[in-house]
Design a protein with these regions (language model features):
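N-terminal secretory/targeting leader peptides
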Residues: 1-40, 49-180
Length: 181
């Protein structure tokens, strides 16, 4: 994000979690069990609330262009399927390095372990953790099925992505170019 703010790169796509460190209002998306389905979530992110959050980004050197679907975060693990609350008990679950995720997975009875994403595959492979939570598309693209036996569609947290452009880049565009983008 700092490269985007500085104008070193023009565009990026990030999870709202990264934006929550700059504006705590983005952490609303990480509250557990807020949305029943993608339709509800999309109505919020694409509606006035989501647009209001994007409107706060220019003061941080960013312009939020739109939200992209990333979906609900789900749990994979190497021990057992998760069908009920008790199934979380004792599982070491890798979570993203945002305090609310530690709180959520502690409350569920698991042992949350914050691990940076680039270290996740190795941590699962070496059994440093039993499982992890992320969106289905990430589970697929990161090949986590190679090191995880069970996928449970827990849908605890909805995780939209935000398409960002550097404000420096945005300001160099003509109004016609901005409309196209």
């Amino acid at each position: 994000i700092s490269s985007l703010q500085g104008g070193t790169i023009d565009f990026t796509i990030v999870s709202t979690g990264l934006l929550s460190s700059m504006n705590k209002d983005f952490s609303i998306y990480y509250l557990p069990m807020v949305f029943n389905d993608a339709r509800e979530a999309d109505a919020v992110v694409d509606g006035p609330f989501g647009q209001k959050l994007l409107a706060k980004l220019p003061e941080k050197g960013l312009v939020g262009l739109t939200y992209w679907e990333h979906g609900f975060r789900n749990v994979t693990n190497s021990k057992r399927p998760i069908a009920k609350l008790e199934d979380f008990q004792g599982l070491k679950i890798r979570v993203i390095q945002i305090p609310i995720f530690v709180d959520i997975y502690s409350a569920l009875g698991s042992n949350p372990v914050p691990i940076p994403f680039p270290e996740l595959y190795t941590a699962l492979e070496q059994k440093a953790v039993d499982g992890q939570e992320t969106a289905l598309s990430t589970i697929d693209t990161a090949n986590l099925a190679e090191v995880q036996k069970f996928l449970s569609t827990t849908r605890i947290v909805y995780d939209p992505l935000v398409v960002l452009i550097s404000k420096k880049t945005w300001d160099r565009l003509s109004s016609d170019e901005q409309k196209i983008v």
